[in-house]
């Protein structure tokens, strides 16, 4: 086992290392961020979750402090990496929460079976169709180009309520209320992610998300959706439930694409309530 210089832990996954942080004690809970994010995407709820759970928040390959995969970057290959990570750390059956792309990832792992316990999927991507596909791709692609171009002045922009509103209007129902630190961390992570462009294209135009027959997922499965999501529109929840008929849908009112930003306390309660129903055998790794 290797330790990063900044005190965060790293675990070898195939021919690379996966960076992650751990906080709290209790039944393990895995957090998986969205495209362009990192473990810091969970800062608004991480400490509250850690009061009751041992939280393990990862940086997926090609994001945060984890090196990219050597081959194709897709939901499938990222799922393979997470599966290997869990197996090597005695975390099979761990409860998991995903956000955005990470929300689709935990749904795919639930579909595969035998990997996760209870699952909470927050505003998952992958359930768009028709005009929504190019809208997702081009709007996010334009956003990342702008974010990269503005990096020299990003601290000043994120320190302003007006700047945060302009930057995060598509992602948050109340972007001006985001803390400057969280906003800056997210914009830095977006700009510095080497796997962003390839994964974005594959999310939009790659493999479509497969579903499961009813009664095939035995563990609790909850899909949370913001009523004001402008990235993955609320109407997409219909297809998500068609493909995952065992899931229960939770609506976040007056909430955008990231419930952990707009509705942190409600998100914490949803996660704890949804995952407490399944006491699995996952144990924390001895690191």
Predicted stretch roles:
Residues 155-216:
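Conserved alpha/beta-hydrolase catalytic His-Asp/Glu region
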Residues 217, 223-225:
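Short beta-strand/loop motif that positions the catalytic acidic residue
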Residues 119-151:
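Flexible "cap/lid" loop of the alpha/beta hydrolase fold
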Residues 21-67:
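Conserved HGGG/HGGXW glycine-rich cap/lid loop of the alpha/beta-hydrolase fold
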